[in-house]
Amino acid sequence: MFALNKCLVKSCGNIAVSTFDASGNIADKENYCLDHTPDPGKAQQEIYNYIKNHDKIVGLNTAGMTFMNIDLTNKRFYGCNFMHCTFTNLH
């Protein structure tokens, strides 16, 4: 299941988006929510790449992201958080 790490901004109550270690695996560490991430474009691209490179996705937190023109064919998601996400033109 995804980690319920809160955003590093103390006044923010949002859940932090997933981060990745040097090997490209989901890391269970503190981070920012999408609104406070210093580089939201980079965070979104890392999540897109993770989805692209894995068929079985476990524990991914993407709260608040917009997914556009992404191919989810044969992808399986387990214990992931897509709260407040927007999905457009998925395949």
Where are each of the predicted segments found?
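Tandem repeat scaffolds
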Residues: 2-27, 43-91
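Cysteine-rich micro-motifs
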Residues: 24-37
